[in-house]
């Protein structure tokens, strides 16, 4: 791999990280990573009707109620963030 290839790959990665929130970066904490994964999962469940209907049947709820519950869970999917240590 040449230096120009590495530069091109890094610039593409930086572009993706700026464009999409869930792609992460070097300073991403474990909590932020987990939040991105959970939100991505909930968005996928809401966006795919068969999965949404599966959850609705499994939990004996209406599809609208399941959609609402998933959207509410997207607000704080992993609970409150941990307190940061001040340096």
UniProtKB/Swiss-Prot annotation:
Which Pfam family, any one of them, does this sequence belong to? SF3b10
- The superkingdom listed in its UniProt entry is Eukaryota
Spans through the membrane: none
Family per similarity comment? Belongs to the SF3B5 family.
List the protein's name: Uncharacterized protein At4g14342
Query: Alphabetically, which GO biological process terms does the record hold?
Result: mRNA splicing, via spliceosome
PANTHER family reported for this sequence: SPLICING FACTOR 3B SUBUNIT 5, SPLICING FACTOR SUBUNIT
Which cysteines link up through disulfide bonds? none
């Amino acid at each position: 791999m040449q230096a120009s290839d590495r530069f091109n790959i890094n610039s593409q990665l930086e572009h993706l990280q700026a464009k999409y929130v869930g792609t992460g970066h070097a300073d991403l904490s474990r909590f932020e990573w987990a939040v991105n994964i959970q939100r991505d999962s909930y968005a996928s469940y809401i966006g795919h009707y068969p999965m949404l209907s599966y959850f609705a049947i499994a939990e004996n709820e209406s599809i609208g109620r399941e959609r609402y519950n998933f959207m509410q869970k997207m607000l704080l999917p992993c609970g409150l963030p941990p307190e940061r240590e001040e340096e």
